[in-house]
Amino acid sequence: MSSSPSPRFVSRLTRNTLVLILAGGRGSRLMDLTTWRAKPAVPFGGKFRIIDFTLSNCINSGIRRIGVLTQYKAHSLIRHLRLGWGSLRGDFGEFVEILPAQQRTEGSWYRGTADAVYQSLDIVRMHDPDYVLILAGDHVYKMDYGPMLARHVETGADVTVGCLEVPVEEASAFGVMAVDGDNRVVRFQEKPADPPSIPGQSDRALASMGIYIFNRAFLFNQLIADARKESDHDFGKDIIPSLIDQARVIAFPFRDAATGGQAYWRDVGTIDAFWRTNLELVGVNPQLNLYDKEWPIWTHQEQLPPAKFVFDDDDRRGMAVDSMVSGGCIISGAYLRRSLLFSSVVVEDGSRVEDAVILPEAHIEPGCRIRKAVIDKHCRLAAGTVIGEDPEEDARRFHLSPGGVVLVTPDMLGQEIHNVYT
């Protein structure tokens, strides 16, 4: 964050809540994009990292006690947290604390989402919260967690599960639940092959967001019991299903506060979803509003000059249409259409970039043609490179997604990346 955010929505309830963000996953469906970074550290939206959305939701909700559990290739994530999220007031009991995997129990790394929290129980005890809010650090959405906390207390729940409606054909990727008239969860299946639909809505299913609120003592008891069992030590696979018949598990539907309809939430866990969700932002009125001053997305703000567009000749003109171009970029006699450029990208004379997501510090030399692609950080494309026009050639040289998006990384280009930050 460029400066410490002003207090908002802070109450006794939010003050007595500890957040644990699960940020240790690789996100293997993002292919080579997560070879050198954890999924929550993947750049998104022109200037952010994916985890910034979850962290910003916490800050904007008035929750200022946050632990981030890391494991897989965490250096770039830890560096980002240190640079961008170190301005909270420790003397006021506010913090973003990094909790790396340390083999605290029996010398093992995190065996699942529940085990990750179990291995940090001593830290949770030290902070002594009334409630523990468990979040995933790899989704893109805006959510005020305050109403969910209030609902958890009002209903006397042992655990509250955030949920949303999804198309039934996509529900197999989620934990799917059924609820009664009071939103009490009566059935929960993790990634079922044949997901049940919502009664009266045969094309929709109620899916878990991977957001859980536990009463502290109840959480401790469940995690200690699970650690003694042979299981996957996972909230969705083990903890939540085991509680349906013996505890009060309440669903909290995530809805748009203004309309009451379906709220914006994206899992950017595949190359196609990552590309599509980024390019949604270049629309005239995207559903995810990054310009909303009432719910800002905080991040580390590198000090960079404004983007620059140069040359206005008949044969070369630096211009961008239906695009977002971040600070530090130089568009030198090149044409951009419906693309999103992160910071410090250079596009040289005669190059044409369409339907592309270009990550920071990429350099596109003269005469390149790029279409429907994701270009990773630090890539340097040689003059005349063509991407996105010949699927067979793209598949041979790069990674071609099922949806036809071409992923290009420095390693695919034979470029050294071991000595740069990711």
UniProtKB/Swiss-Prot annotation:
Which positions are annotated as binding alpha-D-glucose 1-phosphate?
Y110, G175, E190, K191, S208
Pathway linked to the protein: Glycan biosynthesis; glycogen biosynthesis
Q: Which InterPro entries match?
A: ADP-Glc_PPase, ADP_Glu_pyroP_CS, GlgC_bac, GlmU/GlgC-like_hexapep, NTP_transferase_dom, Nucleotide-diphossugar_trans, Trimer_LpxA-like_sf
Transferase keyword on record? yes
Catalytic reactions of this protein: alpha-D-glucose 1-phosphate + ATP + H(+) = ADP-alpha-D-glucose + diphosphate
Origin superkingdom: Bacteria
**What CDD domains does the database record attribute to this sequence?**
ADP_Glucose_PP, LbH_G1P_AT_C
Q: Which UniProt keywords apply?
A: ATP-binding, Carbohydrate metabolism, Glycogen biosynthesis, Glycogen metabolism, Nucleotide-binding, Nucleotidyltransferase, Transferase
PROSITE patterns with a match to the protein in the record: ADP_GLC_PYROPHOSPH_1 (PS00808), ADP_GLC_PYROPHOSPH_2 (PS00809)
Q: Which GO terms describe its biological process?
A: glycogen biosynthetic process
Query: Transmembrane region positions?
Result: none
Similarity field = Belongs to the bacterial/plant glucose-1-phosphate adenylyltransferase family.
The record, for PANTHER family, names: GLUCOSE-1-PHOSPHATE ADENYLYLTRANSFERASE, GLUCOSE-1-PHOSPHATE ADENYLYLTRANSFERASE-RELATED
Function, as annotated, reads:
Involved in the biosynthesis of ADP-glucose, a building block required for the elongation reactions to produce glycogen. Catalyzes the reaction between ATP and alpha-D-glucose 1-phosphate (G1P) to produce pyrophosphate and ADP-Glc.
Question: What is the protein's given name?
Answer: Glucose-1-phosphate adenylyltransferase 2
- Lineage per the UniProt record: Bacteria, Pseudomonadati, Pseudomonadota, Gammaproteobacteria, Chromatiales
